[in-house]
């Protein structure tokens, strides 16, 4: 029998004001009172300084690092500065947590994930998106040892991030369809449990679409729970298949082509509309659901020129070529790409 290790967070703490418990969480989980706290320039003010204050009151020795970008250089810096720490605390958005995730994996120390936004499922997943000289790559990493998601803080972030997180979860639907296709056509390993969890999470969020609003803590809580669940599906699968398919290829292509890309989740949401059309699914419902939460559904709403949308569709199949999707091995012709974007009203 084939056995595989599934990494999941040991503890998940989510709720209003839960960040105040971070000292107790660290005391219960960590062998020593010395940690590296990684933040971003903005997130340090939002939550990082408060985490530092709480842990200093609990007599922790703290090494502070601020990063601007999720690059290989940032990871190397954090690896060097955290090698003697008992854990890394990533306090911030996706870039901060991705760098913290890779550094903790390399140093074989736990990561405590403290997200300040609900923009994508990186807060709980065993994957990290890191930029190198070839672009952005998705790397395997250890899942966070613990996760502390303060919904008060997350709900105060710009609503655009929460809507992007919602969109990222909805993209699970096309991702799983792509995964099924790869299983049928090229016999790629498929996990029924991971796929079921991923799809269930997306459907639960669709059911909650009417209740997702700006500056609303319950809305933030719903999206956070969905992102955590999506991250767990990735852990169960052992790869990002349950949450990343042709729609993510489109988003990554846009990142490479567009001068000013939108948020990852926003691009994946628009990609989901078009890929659902290709898959023969109910793309109109996807579009309607995203509109309910005020997430972008068009090139104009993404703030990206229509030509870049077309070019990203044409180039998308070249992203992670080993990952088979509805785009196939040869991708889309320009005529097909234009037709898909027009039919789904992503372009006019």
Swiss-Prot record:
Keyword Ligase: no
Cellular component, GO annotation: cytoplasm
Example of a GO biological process term: glycerophospholipid metabolic process
Enzyme Commission number(s) from the entry: 1.1.1.261
Swiss-Prot/TrEMBL keywords: Cytoplasm, Lipid biosynthesis, Lipid metabolism, Metal-binding, NAD, NADP, Oxidoreductase, Phospholipid biosynthesis, Phospholipid metabolism, Zinc
Positions that bind NAD(+): 94-98, 116, 125
Residue numbers binding substrate: 121, 168, 252
Transmembrane segments: none
Record-linked CDD domains: Gro1PDH (cd08173)
Binding site for Zn(2+): 168, 248, 264
Zinc listed as a keyword: yes
Pathways involved: Membrane lipid metabolism; glycerophospholipid metabolism
Cofactor binding, note field: Binds 1 zinc ion per subunit.
Catalytic activity line of the entry: sn-glycerol 1-phosphate + NAD(+) = dihydroxyacetone phosphate + NADH + H(+); sn-glycerol 1-phosphate + NADP(+) = dihydroxyacetone phosphate + NADPH + H(+)
Localization of this protein: Cytoplasm
Cofactor(s), names only, from the UniProt record: Zn(2+)
EC class: oxidoreductase
Molecular function GO terms recorded: glycerol-1-phosphate dehydrogenase (NAD+) activity; glycerol-1-phosphate dehydrogenase (NADP+) activity; metal ion binding
Function: Catalyzes the NAD(P)H-dependent reduction of dihydroxyacetonephosphate (DHAP or glycerone phosphate) to glycerol 1-phosphate (G1P). The G1P thus generated is used as the glycerophosphate backbone of phospholipids in the cellular membranes of Archaea.
Family: Belongs to the glycerol-1-phosphate dehydrogenase family.
Subunit structure comment from the entry: Homooctamer.
Name of the featured protein: Glycerol-1-phosphate dehydrogenase [NAD(P)+]
Protein's organism: Methanosphaera stadtmanae (strain ATCC 43021 / DSM 3091 / JCM 11832 / MCB-3)
């Amino acid at each position: 029998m084939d056995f595989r290790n599934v990494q999941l967070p040991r503890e998940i703490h989510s709720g209003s004001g839960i960040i105040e418990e971070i000292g107790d969480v660290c005391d219960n989980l960590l062998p020593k009172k010395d940690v590296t706290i990684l933040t971003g320039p903005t997130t340090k003010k939002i939550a990082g300084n408060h985490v530092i204050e709480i842990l200093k009151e609990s007599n922790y020795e703290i090494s502070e690092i601020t990063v601007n970008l999720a690059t290989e250089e940032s990871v190397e810096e954090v690896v060097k500065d955290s090698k003697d720490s008992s854990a890394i605390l990533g306090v911030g958005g996706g870039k901060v947590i991705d760098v913290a995730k890779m550094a903790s994996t390399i140093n074989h120390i736990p990561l405590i994930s403290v997200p300040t936004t609900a923009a994508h499922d990186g807060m709980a997943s065993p994957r990290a998106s890191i930029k190198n000289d070839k672009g952005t790559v998705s790397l395997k990493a250890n899942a966070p040892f613990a996760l502390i998601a303060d919904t008060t803080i997350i709900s105060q972030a710009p609503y655009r991030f929460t809507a992007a997180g919602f969109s990222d979860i909805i993209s699970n639907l096309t991702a799983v369809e792509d995964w099924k296709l790869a299983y049928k056509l090229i016999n790629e390993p498929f996990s029924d449990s991971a796929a079921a969890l991923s799809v269930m999470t997306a459907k639960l969020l669709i059911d909650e679409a009417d209740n997702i609003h700006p500056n609303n803590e319950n809305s933030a809580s719903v999206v956070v729970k969905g992102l955590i669940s999506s991250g767990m599906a990735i852990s169960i699968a052992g790869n990002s298949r349950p949450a990343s398919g042709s729609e993510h290829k489109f988003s990554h292509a846009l990142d490479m082509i567009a001068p000013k890309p939108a948020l990852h989740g926003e691009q994946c949401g628009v990609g989901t509309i078009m890929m659902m059309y290709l898959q023969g699914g109910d793309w109109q419902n996807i579009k309607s659901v995203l509109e309910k939460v005020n997430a972008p559904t068009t090139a104009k709403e993404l703030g990206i020129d229509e030509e870049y949308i077309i070019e990203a569709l044409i180039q998308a199949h070249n992203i992670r070529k080993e990952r088979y999707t509805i785009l196939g091995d040869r991708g889309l012709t320009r005529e097909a790409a234009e037709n898909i974007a027009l039919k789904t009203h992503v372009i006019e």
